[in-house]
Each structure stands twice: as C-alpha cells, then as structure tokens.
C-alpha cells in the first residue's frame, strides 16, 4: 500500500486533504464554504467527491451523521472558520451522543494570527473537545494526512462518534510535502474471553426472569443478525432503547416488550423491574438513564465493544468486552435450553401483544380532527414498510412513534435520545437518501422542530431527494408544555403561531399537502408517498392525551 501512495510535493495542502478523503472512501462532503476553507472546496472540484452545499452548518453535521450511521463509515462536514465552526457544534454533539461517525473539517485563521484579535479567530479545538471523541488543529503541514486519517479512526472505532480537525488557512493554501495514508479502518476485535462467556451462559441457565436490554450498538447490522440467533436459541424476553429500533426481527416479535425511554412505564420497564438478570447489549447510559430502570435487584451483564462507563446505577457484575456479534454468537452456542417464561413475564408480554392488536384493529377508528396521535401512527405503520427508511425528530410525536410504530430492519429508523436535538429529521433524511437513493425516506417532526432545519427543503429539492416529510402540527412546543403543566400547572414560552406549511413547501419547489379532515389522512399519505421527490404533509394533531404518556397508559384507555 505504501508504494501506491508515494511521498510527493503538493501545490496546496488542500490537495493532500482531498486525496486523503478519497483514500478514506468519502463519496460526498456536506458544508458551506468561506475564505478560510475555500481552497479545500476548490480542490474538491478535481476529485471524485461530490460537494453538497447546505443551508446551515449544523445540518451538514446531521447529514454526515446519517451517512455514518447507515454505512458505518464516517460522513464528512466541511465548514469555514468562526461562526462556520460554532454553528456546527450542535450537530457534532448530537452525533457524538448518538454514536454516529462524523469527521468535520473546519477552517481557521493563519497560524501567525492565532494569538491576535482578527476576523473569525476562535479556539475551535477547545470548543469541540468536550463534544467530540477527537479534536485537533493541524499545526505542521506535513502532518495533514496523519491527522485526517486519525480523525476517521477515532470517529469509526469503538463506540462511534464525532471528530473535528481545524485547518489553518496557510496550511491548506500553501505547498506541502507528504503522502496519502491508506485507509486502515477500525481494528477488528475478537469476541469476549471464553471463560467470561461461559460465566454469563451459567447465569442465564440459573435465571428465572432474564431480559435483554438493547442499545444503539445492538442495531448495527452484523450485531443484529447475531442477536436474532441468540433470541431464537434462548427465547429470553427483550426490550430496547429508542435508538436500537429495528434490532429485533418479526420472528422474535412475540418476546419483544417494546421500546423503553424517558418515562419508566412501559412493558419493557415492568420486565426490567421483575428481572433477576439484565443483559445489556450495545447499551450506553446516555440512551436511557440507568436510574430509571435499574432496580438494583438483578445481576447486571454488560456486552459491548468498550468497558462500561460506571455510575452508581450502572456497575455491571460481568462485562463481555469485544466484538459484539462474535460474543453473541459464542454465547448462543453455550445456551443448551430455551427459557420457560415465568407466569408474571408471560402475562406482561401477553398484555403487550394485546395492545398491539388493539392498535392495529382500532387505530384507524379514531376519527376526531385534529387527529389523535395513535391514528397518525397507525397510518404511518402502513407506509413505513421494510424498504422505507424513517428519521424521527424530537417532540411529543417521537414518544408515540417510538412506542407504537414497529420496524424490523436494522438501522431502518434514526431517532435521537442522547441530546434529544430538535431539527434533525429532515437533514438526516437527506443524508440517508444519498446513501440509498433507491429507498424512500420518511422524516417526521413537529411544527417546532421543522422550522429549525426547514431551509434544507431547498437542498432536498436541488438534489431531487425522494424524501417525504410529515409535520405534526399543534402550534406549540408540546413536549415541554406537558412537563411544565405537570410541574407548575401553567405554561411558559411554549406557544407560537400557525403557518401555511403546504405553501411554504411549495415555495421551495417541493410538493405540499395539508390534511384537512380525519378521513383525508390515509389518502393524503398515499398520494404523498407516490411523489418522486421532496414532499411535505402537514397533519393537525390533538395532543390532549399526552399527559397519559407519563403515567401507566394502557391503550384500552384510548381505543
């Protein structure tokens, strides 16, 4: 490989940066140019890499994160100095919390100007260090390839996340001597030690009420395949965080207690409280706080690529650290009988199944207008088939969807819980579509979150992205409102005015739809799904039942 990339003289450091990106297999770069980084944009014109101009830097990071989550290879954002970098912060923090590999390259003032009060001077490394896995400035031109290569390694290995590289203007504009480094990828790990796997197999054999708790890393495709074999072998009940959506397939659906998160009141939560053995697979505490679900009465097993980050409510008794898929496959081989459910666990799963069937039969009969959230979820279930990718923003709708809409393909759903960032869904959808243009992407937001990234409709139209965006309209920040009402019995700062979302979408060149009656919901969604290109559907929603989400909600109370 060294002979393939000899040391050579580059007219500009930017040329070496771009060649290093090509060596990493980068297919597109999301960003906004500026004077401190425009030489890199110029060099990209002579490369195989596609430039995707965006309308806000945070959205560049969101789009790159979608590429990273779906492919496992870091997506790339490219921004200028000063506010170009500071605008990027939310996207990078979100990617880091959600485990999405992203590499961001940010322009910076010339090295000689770092200590001066000059235009757009900012200590971006200090700014990004707390919210990334890796943040560094290139201080010597001949280190360019090494720094960029290591940024990819940091972003992609272990639990993936974000990495930031600061590129001073004189480093990328000036000549440099160096060579491109071949992409080495993340190092291949082996399974956890055999004796530790044997120990967990014995714990499973002795347990009366074991349960698997799945986290984001369990939904990586190879891990998901191994998990499904383990579920079939063991017949152990399973629950998951929101981020692990799609890890459990339809064959194991009868043992799936649904997703858990935010409020401790789901079937999965009841099984966790009942459990004498909890096996966490690919889980990070940022996905669902251990204090919410860990009773302290169960033996706790941690299976992941990294040791557990311990806290008072998460101190595993056994840790299986290594390649997750390899570990799960070995564990499955060590299990010699299927679990017989305890009467209590069997009843919890039967009740969960009853509620699923109730929603399937009666969800479409909720005829009030504005629409009940379950009516919308039931209609969405019909359009989000296995070929559709779903991206979900943050808001009250996110809880209804996470609890009651089911998907069975690993990484089919992108949902945020680490930072609970508003505005992610539309840029995520654009990034996801670029990875798989043959797949329709459906994104969902509230009317609050939508306007935080709605300018990217122009990007979607320019790219002719086959993206359908659904807006649940209630003229307020409802998820905050229901919590304020519970805590203070009054509302503050959560109401805003209406707008014509159909006209707004059409002003960008997208196809706009507005649901104007309950009976129009399903026909409108079908018509919007038939659009070959960007489309937006505004759906008025009645959130009066949202306080029930924080209690022991049983669907028979509504349906």
UniProtKB/Swiss-Prot annotation:
Pathway: Polyol metabolism; (R,R)-butane-2,3-diol biosynthesis; (R,R)-butane-2,3-diol from pyruvate: step 1/3. It is an enzyme of class 2 (transferase). InterPro entries: Acetolactate_synth_catblc, DHS-like_NAD/FAD-binding_dom, THDP-binding, Thiamin_PyroP_enz_cen_dom, Thiamin_PyroP_enz_TPP-bd_dom, TPP-bd_CS, TPP_enz, TPP_enzyme_TPP-bd. The keyword Cell inner membrane does not apply. Mg(2+) binds at residue 447. Pfam families: TPP_enzyme_C, TPP_enzyme_M, TPP_enzyme_N. One of its GO terms (cellular component) is acetolactate synthase complex. Its EC number is 2.2.1.6. GO terms for molecular function: acetolactate synthase activity; flavin adenine dinucleotide binding; magnesium ion binding; thiamine pyrophosphate binding. Optimum pH is 6. GO terms for biological process: butanediol metabolic process; isoleucine biosynthetic process; L-valine biosynthetic process. Gene3D superfamilies: 3.40.50.970, Single helix bin, TPP-binding domain. FAD binds at residues 159, 263-284, 304-323. It catalyses: 2 pyruvate + H(+) = (2S)-2-acetolactate + CO2. Keywords: FAD, Flavoprotein, Magnesium, Metal-binding, Thiamine pyrophosphate, Transferase. Belongs to the TPP enzyme family. PANTHER family: ACETOLACTATE SYNTHASE (PTHR18968:SF129), THIAMINE PYROPHOSPHATE ENZYMES (PTHR18968). Does not seem to require thiamine pyrophosphate. Valine resistant. This is Acetolactate synthase, catabolic. It comes from Klebsiella pneumoniae. The gene is budB.
């Amino acid at each position: 490989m060294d002979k393939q990339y000899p040391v050579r003289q580059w007219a500009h450091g930017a040329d070496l940066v771009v060649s290093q990106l090509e060596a990493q297999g980068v297919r597109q770069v999301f960003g906004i140019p500026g004077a401190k980084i425009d030489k890199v944009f110029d060099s990209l014109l002579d490369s195989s890499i596609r430039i995707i101009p965006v309308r806000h830097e945070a959205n560049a990071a969101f789009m790159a994160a979608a590429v990273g989550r779906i492919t496992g290879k870091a997506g790339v954002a490219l921004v200028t100095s000063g506010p170009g970098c500071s605008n990027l912060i939310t996207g990078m923090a979100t990617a880091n919390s959600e485990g999405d590999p992203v590499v961001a390259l940010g322009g910076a003032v010339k090295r000689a100007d770092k200590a001066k009060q000059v235009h757009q001077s900012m200590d971006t490394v200090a700014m990004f260090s707390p919210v990334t896995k890796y943040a560094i400035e290139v201080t010597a031109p001949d280190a360019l390839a090494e720094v960029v290569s290591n940024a990819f390694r940091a972003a992609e290995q272990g639990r993936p996340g974000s990495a930031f590289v600061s590129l001073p203007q004189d480093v990328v504009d000036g000549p440099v001597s160096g060579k491109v480094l071949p992409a080495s990828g993340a190092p291949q790990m082996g399974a956890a030690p055999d004796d530790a796997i044997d120990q967990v197999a014995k714990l499973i054999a002795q347990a009366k009420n074991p349960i698997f708790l799945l986290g984001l890393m369990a939904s990586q495709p190879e891990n998901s395949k191994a998990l499904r074999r383990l579920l079939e072998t063991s017949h152990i009940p399973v629950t998951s965080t929101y981020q692990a959506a799609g890890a459990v397939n339809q064959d194991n659906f009868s043992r799936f207690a649904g997703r858990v998160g935010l409020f401790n009141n789901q079937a999965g939560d009841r099984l966790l409280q009942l459990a004498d053995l909890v096996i966490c697979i690919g889980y990070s505490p940022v996905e669902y706080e251990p204090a919410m679900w860990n009773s302290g009465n169960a033996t706790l097993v941690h299976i992941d690529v990294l040791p557990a980050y311990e806290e008072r409510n998460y101190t595993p008794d056994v840790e299986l650290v290594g390649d997750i898929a390899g570990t799960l496959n070995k564990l499955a081989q060590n299990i010699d009988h299927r679990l017989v459910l305890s009467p209590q666990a069997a009843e919890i799963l039967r009740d969960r199944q009853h509620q699923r069937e109730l929603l399937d039969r009666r969800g479409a009969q909720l005829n009030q207008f504005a629409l009940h959230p379950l009516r919308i979820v039931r209609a969405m279930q019909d359009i989000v088939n296995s070929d559709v990718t779903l991206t979900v923003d943050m808001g009250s709708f996110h809880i209804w969807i996470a609890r009651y809409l089911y998907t069975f393909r690993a990484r089919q759903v992108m949902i945020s819980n680490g930072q609970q960032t508003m505005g992610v869904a539309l840029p995520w959808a654009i990034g996801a579509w670029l990875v798989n243009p043959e797949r329709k992407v459906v994104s969902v937001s509230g009317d609050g979150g939508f306007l935080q990234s709605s300018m990217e409709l122009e990007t979607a139209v320019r790219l002719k992205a086959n993206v359908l965006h659904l807006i649940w309209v209630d003229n307020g920040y409802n998820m905050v409102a229901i919590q304020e009402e519970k805590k203070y019995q009054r509302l503050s700062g959560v109401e805003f005015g209406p707008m014509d979302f159909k006209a707004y979408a059409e002003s960008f060149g997208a196809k706009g739809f507005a649901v104007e009656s309950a009976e129009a919901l399903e026909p409108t969604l079908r018509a919007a799904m038939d659009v070959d290109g960007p489309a937006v559907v505004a759906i008025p929603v009645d959130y009066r039942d949202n306080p029930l989400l924080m209690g022991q909600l049983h669907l028979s109370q509504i349906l």
